[in-house]
């Protein structure tokens, strides 16, 4: 265990090195106080703390030269799970199956070859695979890295691959438009496995802010003026309009949130990828199994 490793001379030396570095000096605290370690976490803050601590534990294991038991988590059933109600599936037939969103490491995860094996295995088992690209990186020096990662994903997810080109809200007047993006992404692949219709330019940031605002307005009839995310929402939806003015007018806030949601272009992705995958869950499970043969 890491506690036993810490008691060795090599462990003590590693600990001293960690304590001297600003971004790693607090990693040892998770061994000194394991109160964060629970079987279940409830509420946003508890869940965030638990996941952050698990991430720190993996970093600590690597820093101390201990191999993390990635093979123990090869099955999705053994991974940490956040159980939430997905609002866009409310009211749908539960007999069609459940939706599990699995965030896998990138194909070229630096220094972690075990994660590449895990990633490929989980992608082969998935009913649908959503690759997330950064619009701002498409025409940069990182383009070749993006191309390699996308091809690595496409190799194991043919017929089940969809691509979200995120941060499309950062497009300026000289940037590629939506139609151009839909043509460019399939051209990055070595094989003809991705039709342009499965490429979705969009903004997850705008979608998140709009969806959260609409949820608050439906639930409470107003926006919580003192919460930081409301500042981001007002800035994104209304520009330089004063926050107090927006928060006092629920009809105006709802209209702005609705427009922001539509402008994010995420609705089409949810409809065509997530809802479609959910409605065809049984058939996709068979396709996924056949793809591994």
Give the label of every model feature segment.
Residues 1-280:
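Globular "head" domains of long coiled-coil molecular machines
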Residues 276-293:
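Long, non-membrane, amphipathic alpha-helices that form coiled-coils
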């Amino acid at each position: 265990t890491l506690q036993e490793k810490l008691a060795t001379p090599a462990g003590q030396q590693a600990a001293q090195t960690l304590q001297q570095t600003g971004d790693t000096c607090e990693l040892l605290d998770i061994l000194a106080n394991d109160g964060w370690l629970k079987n279940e976490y409830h509420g946003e803050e508890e869940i965030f703390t638990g996941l952050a601590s698990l991430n720190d534990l993996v970093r600590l294991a690597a820093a101390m030269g201990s191999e993390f038991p990635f093979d123990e988590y090869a099955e999705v059933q053994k991974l940490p799970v956040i159980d939430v109600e997905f609002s866009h599936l409310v009211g749908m037939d539960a007999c069609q199956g459940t939706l599990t969103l699995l965030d896998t490491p990138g194909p070229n995860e630096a220094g972690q070859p075990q994660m590449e094996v895990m990633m490929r295995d989980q992608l082969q088992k998935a009913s649908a695979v959503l690759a997330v690209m950064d619009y701002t990186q498409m025409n940069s020096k990182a383009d070749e890295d993006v191309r390699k990662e996308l091809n690595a994903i496409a190799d194991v997810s043919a017929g089940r691959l969809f691509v979200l080109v995120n941060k499309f809200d950062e497009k300026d007047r000289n940037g590629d438009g939506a139609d151009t993006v839909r043509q460019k992404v399939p051209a990055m692949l070595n094989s003809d496995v991705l039709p342009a219709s499965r490429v979705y330019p969009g903004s997850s940031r705008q979608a998140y802010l709009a969806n959260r605002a609409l949820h608050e307005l439906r639930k409470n009839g107003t926006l919580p003026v003192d919460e930081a995310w409301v500042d981001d929402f007002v800035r994104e939806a209304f520009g330089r309009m004063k926050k107090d003015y927006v928060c006092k007018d629920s009809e105006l806030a709802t209209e702005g949130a609705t427009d922001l949601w539509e402008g994010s272009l995420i609705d089409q992705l949810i409809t065509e990828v997530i809802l479609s995958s959910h409605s065809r869950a049984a058939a996709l499970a068979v396709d996924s199994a056949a793809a591994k043969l």
